[in-house]
């Protein structure tokens, strides 16, 4: 397995709308494994293929962070949502930053598993929030897009500064 490079906001590639997966082959299975490896390495609970510059509708989730409840959603569709909730969300593409995003408390999602079999999932709590967050990525949306322009610009400035610091340390 390989750790993939996570795109950092405001990288324009994060705005790309992902295409549906049509082939379920060994390459897809390896990519899913690499997504999980990357997600765990970065200490995340969810990752969308868009975040690693692959613009296919693939999401990996494990809200335990302990490799015990791996969930793969391919070509996910939100069918229903109810209730209102929200938390200070973080994101691997916005390292070290958090922002409040209003979300549905419960969601129903239809997706394909890694073998291409369709299933329906009813989720609530953190799992529901994570699913909505990752589907946003597939639609070219990051949580910063929900924030005021002032907060969004501050985040961009912090991340540009962080990227410059990282570049200097790597040189």
Curated annotation (Swiss-Prot):
Claim: Electron transport is one of the keywords in the record: no
UniProt keyword list: Hydrolase, Iron, Metal-binding, Protein biosynthesis
Catalytic reactions on record: N-terminal N-formyl-L-methionyl-[peptide] + H2O = N-terminal L-methionyl-[peptide] + formate
Record-linked InterPro entries: Peptide_deformylase, Peptide_deformylase_sf
Residues spanning the signal sequence: none
CDD domains cross-referenced by the UniProt entry: Pep_deformylase
Keyword Transport part of the UniProt annotation: no
Cofactor binding mode and count: Binds 1 Fe(2+) ion.
Catalytic machinery residues: 134
Cofactor: Fe(2+)
Catalytic class of the enzyme: hydrolase
Function: Removes the formyl group from the N-terminal Met of newly synthesized proteins. Requires at least a dipeptide for an efficient rate of reaction. N-terminal L-methionine is a prerequisite for activity but the enzyme has broad specificity at other positions.
Entry's family note: Belongs to the polypeptide deformylase family.
Record-given protein name: Peptide deformylase
Organism: Mannheimia succiniciproducens (strain KCTC 0769BP / MBEL55E)
